[in-house]
Amino acid sequence: MSRSSKKSPFISYRLFNTIDKMNLKNLKQLVFTKSRSSTVFPSMVGHNISVYNGKNYVPFLILNQMISSKLGEFSRTRNFRGHKGINKKLIKKSSKKVTKNKKSIKKNIKTTSKKFKK
């Protein structure tokens, strides 16, 4: 469910104050925050913000395209390790079978070629 149109977008009070102070002093320092639910405002554009993802802080630069999105969208909380796929042991076993089959085929070819030469 979306936020009511009567309410303004949420931003952490502490985060808003630090960015406002940095804008007044023309500073561009890294800001650390745990507020993933804060909305990106136009005053934040150009600042480097590090958002906590539960394990460590993920830094990124705020761009114009990020306005009105949440800070949590830019720091992943889960790592994608890939789909299950084929087991590597099965691949090794199947490759061994193929090489054995190739060797047996070569032996058969040699024996049949000897038979035809006679």
Curated annotation (Swiss-Prot):
InterPro entries: Ribosomal_uS19, Ribosomal_uS19_bac-type, Ribosomal_uS19_CS, Ribosomal_uS19_SF. Residues 92-118 are annotated as: Disordered. One of its GO terms (molecular function) is structural constituent of ribosome. SUPFAM superfamilies: Ribosomal protein S19. It holds the Pfam family Ribosomal_S19. PROSITE patterns: RIBOSOMAL_S19. The keyword Plastid applies. Keywords: Plastid, Ribonucleoprotein, Ribosomal protein, RNA-binding, rRNA-binding. One of its GO terms (biological process) is ribosomal small subunit assembly. It is found in: Plastid. GO terms for cellular component: plastid; small ribosomal subunit. Protein S19 forms a complex with S13 that binds strongly to the 16S ribosomal RNA. PANTHER family: RIBOSOMAL PROTEIN S19P FAMILY MEMBER, SMALL RIBOSOMAL SUBUNIT PROTEIN US19M. Belongs to the universal ribosomal protein uS19 family. This is Small ribosomal subunit protein uS19c. It comes from Euglena longa (Euglenophycean alga).
